[in-house]
Amino acid sequence: MSVLSWLLDLLYPPKCVLCRKLLTGKGPVCPHCMDKLPEFDGAAPSVRFTSGGAVSFFYEGQLRESFLRFKFGGSAFYAQTYGAWMAHTIRDRLAGKYDVLTWAPVSRARKRKRGYDQSALLCREIGTQLRLEPIQTLRKIKDPPAQSTLADAAQRRANVSGAYLSLIHISEP
């Protein structure tokens, strides 16, 4: 451990990314929370317009609260933990089944407000873990209402319709 890391840990002791209690051991999650993570171990979900997907954990409880802190609460450093978990899931469940690593970007206004694009941070961390360079394939050209304000999948699809511009051309083989 470097002197700088030691000083930072002294001034800002590391906390569990889920419950935010002080960590006594190594890793970003305390043993209590690690045992209670809502791990998804079922079948691969069906993802429209793709040949499949993978889920690391159910989006509920402390994990959901933690992810909302990452997304809206200035906890950009959580990307390391979430990215590592997602990369592990990709290696486990999607090895050899993907062609590109990309993300759906937030609007400039949301990026300015938050200070970062959480999707891009996650994608870069996953890329680091998988030794795969992410490729930006989309640009957000409209800033519709937040998806979280909408009630169902149909409203969410309609909300993002026309919001993104493709930066690449994909041709059929």
Per-region residue spans from a language model:
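Glycine-rich phosphate/pyrophosphate-handling loop used in enzymes and phosphotransfer proteins
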Residues: 1-171
